[in-house]
Amino acid sequence: MRVFPDDNFLDSACRSISGEAAKALVSLKGGRIAEDAVSVIEDWFEPSLEKARLLADLDERIRIHSSEGDQGLLRPALKARAVIAASPEPAPDDYEPSFKVVPATTLGGDWKSDCETDCVIVDGDLIADGTLILNDLSETLCVIVLGSLRARNLDCGGWVFVRDELECDHLYACSLNDGILSVGGNITVQTFLETGTYTQVAGHLTASYLGSTHNSIDVEGKVNCPGFERRSDSDYLCEWIDPVLLEADDSDGDWRCGRQRYPSADYPERIRAGGSPMKFVL
């Protein structure tokens, strides 16, 4: 799988910029995602000395709100934890964060983002006719698209900001619970599964099938997905996910077929291979 922007034709058009220049560019062109994206850039390199205490406090609040089923308090707490957790431990004095800007582009085949760069900014639309993997599972890497993002399959971790529209066949989001997928426009997909990424959509969300097993999905516009209210139910996930991509939840103790089964590590592998996670064809 090829890497952008390092080992392809974009390399000559790619330029490195400072953190201040990155914030200025995102502030100017970021639209609805600008404020949160700039905040992430700033927080990375201004780590709090009270980080551990703050995370412990938020973890306790999240536990309480989750047990009480209070979504109104749970969602802000999850978002606050994600922001704080994304800021790294104090870096060495000689550490210089890396920011790269690439122009709008269309990529042929399968690609993944450069994980040696702290933040990749696409100044325009990013289109891939194959699978696109952003940030792997890293919680301290960021991709900002100052336009729309389109791909056949999309696997995203860390911090991903898309100013306009996000469209793909199958979307998978996981960043070990501390990342964010933020879209300033609409998300339009066949399937969307999150297993550890806080998702916020300023526009509408349209999906044939959707699953959420760890964090919340906040949509300011309309939700066009028949199973949205059941997105965390094991029974619902079993209705549309290929059985070979499911595994029993050991903590539940219920091994009956079709109950308490959740996506396994094979699910993201299917997405990365360019396949469909569904048990049937739409």
Q: Where are the predicted features?
A:
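Extracellular beta-strand solenoids
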Residues: 101, 107, 113, 121-123, ...
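Terminal non-domain segments
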Residues: 1-109, 232-282
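Short aromatic-glycine motifs in intrinsically disordered, low-complexity regions
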Residues: 117, 134-141
